[in-house]
Amino acid sequence: MNCPIIDQLERLTEHHFKDEERLKKALTHSSVQDSEQGNYERLEFLGDRVLGLLIAEMLYKLFPQASEGELSVRLNGLVNAQTCADIALEMGLPDMIHVGFEMRNLKGRRLTNMHADVIEALIAVMYLDGGLKSVRPFIRRYWQSRAKQMDAGRRDAKTELQEWAHVQGGVQPHYRVVKRSGPDHDPVFMVEVSILGFAPEIGQGNSKRCAERMAAEKVLRREGIWKTMGKNDHE
């Protein structure tokens, strides 16, 4: 394997790689048919679990007052494909990935997923080199600041409710206007949000968007997701 690439990866990950062939596998897509060392798929499977565990551990320590529901939402936001792909781009990993000819013009979600997979495969390599302690510096370097930024202020309630609902089983919140009143220049909307398996809530506002947000906030508070919310967090 190219020594400058190894040196660059060791600087980026703060880890000394012990198995060059395994590292090479982590950077090889399954579309490379003539590859003798294999591809990153098995490593990605392992790395996904290691990442989830270490992010859960980090969140548990960073947010001692957060409920289980809030921790789950934060976890989902930090281990999803987009976050991992963003970190891959930050590290310059796309230029190091070995792909087959037909994959070189990949775009959109499939490209995002591939970049995320390589991050997870890289995590697996570090874990196999030296266990969880070998991965923690890498997690701190790229995920800790992101985790803290998530706490700088509440995200949009609808976005947070959607992520929480996904954690609960993949269902999506459904919003519908149940009442509209008032004059055209000063309308009042009442919107109901429902999630399969949970009681609905109704929000009220001067626009559909505002009413939807208020309904979403009610669910987040009721389910304990925003249990630690301060009085100004939603302003």
Swiss-Prot record:
Catalyses which reaction?
Answer: Endonucleolytic cleavage to 5'-phosphomonoester
UniProt organism field: Bartonella quintana (strain Toulouse) (Rochalimaea quintana)
Subunit field text:
Homodimer.
Q: Which family does it belong to?
A: Belongs to the ribonuclease III family.
GO terms in the biological process aspect are:
mRNA processing; regulation of gene expression; rRNA processing; tRNA processing
Q: Which domain of life is it from?
A: Bacteria
CDD domains to which the protein is assigned, alphabetical? DSRM_RNAse_III_family, RIBOc
SMART domains under this entry? DSRM, RIBOc
The identity of this protein, by name, is Ribonuclease 3
Q: Which UniProt keywords apply?
A: Cytoplasm, Endonuclease, Hydrolase, Magnesium, Metal-binding, mRNA processing, Nuclease, RNA-binding, rRNA processing, rRNA-binding, tRNA processing
The encoding gene? rnc
Q: Where in the cell is it found?
A: Cytoplasm
